[in-house]
């Protein structure tokens, strides 16, 4: 079953899309944040059982070439519109591996940013 999250005034997102939007909004609100600071905020540990991946991956070629690495699906948002840049100029992408358990900490960041959202199953 999929969970849909509605961000006030913006419509619905899947869990993975919501995480991407949270990171994008964080980067927009805090544009001077370095990549290391972003990695500290968006901890790899949040991924829990998917923590073999990075939450924020700066090796975009590796993220895009998942088939060549023998993976069965992409682990990152790699469309050009989803490649983000930290305050110190590091390009990075966001992991897609989110479920109802590991998204909780990321939603906490959204709440700290003042976002209003609801969870619909």
Please annotate each region the language model reported.
Residues 1-121:
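Intrinsically disordered, charged low-complexity linkers and terminal tails
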